[in-house]
Amino acid sequence: MDLKDEFIQIIKKYSELSLKESENETKKYIQEVFNVSLSEVFIKEPSKQETLKQEPTQETNGCIYIFKKGKNIGQKCGSGKSKFCYKHKKNDLNIKVNQERNIKKPIPKPIPTNKIETGSVINQNWFIGTSIGKGGFGEIYSAAKFNDHGNYKDDDFSFAIKIEPKSNGPLFVEMHFYKRVIVEKEIEKFKLQKNIQYLGLPKYYGSGLYNDYRYIVMEKYDSNIDKLFRNGDLNSSTILQIGIQILNIVEYIHSKGYIHADIKGENILLKENDTSHIYLVDFGLCSRYSNIYQPDPKKAHNGTLKYTSRDSHQGVESRRGDLEILGYNMIEWSGGILPWQHLCKKSAGKKILNEVSESKIKYMNDLSLFFNKVQFNDTNLKNKLQTYFETIIKITFEELPPYQLLHNIFN
């Protein structure tokens, strides 16, 4: 896909949102999509005298110029061959981008050990407690909230604060996902429509910048499904119960136009090992859903390799892909060994990535072979999961998944 086609696809996905937001929010949307810093994004209202031959006043390589309600703006503008504008007819939104935006930026450095110390105070709101988890770039701490009098309760570290370098993209994406999707009013409306009492999405308490770091604050949990699995604490009934809850969550996320793309045991949290109320977290790989199937090599193989969907291996995020990822997890929780599992190493190169992708394609094209290869202790659970996979592999890319039918299979 050349730059123009990619550009048009992205603008079609984002233009409706962009015009509903303030200028700063529009900049953030574009920053998220094109992976540039906010200083590289400019929004201006072109005057009636502006023509295609005139350059915007800002002259910076790798910039994106956004024109709202512009006139005389065509699909190519400026003197540079790699520069062009695209006008989205529905919302009259015009954006200009330089091909030089594809210059690779340095990978942000992880937070050094003990850089954020216990006892630190973030923006006069949050008191940092002990570290409760560490990832590739950031760290998660317990936290207490200051009240209006500047005090906090010593025994109330019921919050979790996730901190990463502010140049790291996933936490930026996650922060905006929380703001746009985890909205209590919308969640309550969905629960009412679906006649369910509970939807496993974490409570969001705020986010912001702290020195050279970005942070997000959410509810703190006690454990995750991966730990229960490794301890042998997942039986067939519990696995099906978790599957039903995840189906509810992804249906809601999909209804808001997003794909999760990284469902796995480590990202499914719970309190006091209560599997009747699980919470799906980590939205750093979330992306907006597009009904155009357009593989993107830059996004190919995103996610956790063992569970990545066939679409994700091609650089396309899809609703059916989330369901496929869930199915792979449920097989593993059931004690099954995925046929490509031995290939999934932390430092997998391109050859291994392609081998895993090809293995999934092979087995999804022959489910009988797949389920003969995977070992199950529970025949009833195996039959349910086989029916589940037989259903989801028939879903076309653009098709809305039959969530209720999948519920019925697990019930």
UniProtKB/Swiss-Prot annotation:
Residues 126-410 form the Protein kinase domain. InterPro entries: CK1_Ser-Thr_kinase (IPR050235), Kinase-like_dom_sf (IPR011009), Prot_kinase_dom (IPR000719), Protein_kinase_ATP_BS (IPR017441), Ser/Thr_kinase_AS (IPR008271). GO terms for molecular function: ATP binding; protein serine kinase activity; protein serine/threonine kinase activity. The active site is at D262. Its EC number is 2.7.11.1. The keyword Isomerase does not apply. Keywords: ATP-binding, Kinase, Nucleotide-binding, Serine/threonine-protein kinase, Transferase. The keyword GTP-binding does not apply. ATP binds at I132, G133, K134, G135, G136, F137, G138, E139, I140, K162. PROSITE patterns: PROTEIN_KINASE_ATP, PROTEIN_KINASE_DOM, PROTEIN_KINASE_ST. It catalyses: L-seryl-[protein] + ATP = O-phospho-L-seryl-[protein] + ADP + H(+); L-threonyl-[protein] + ATP = O-phospho-L-threonyl-[protein] + ADP + H(+). Belongs to the protein kinase superfamily. Ser/Thr protein kinase family. This is Probable serine/threonine-protein kinase 389L. It comes from Invertebrate iridescent virus 6 (IIV-6).
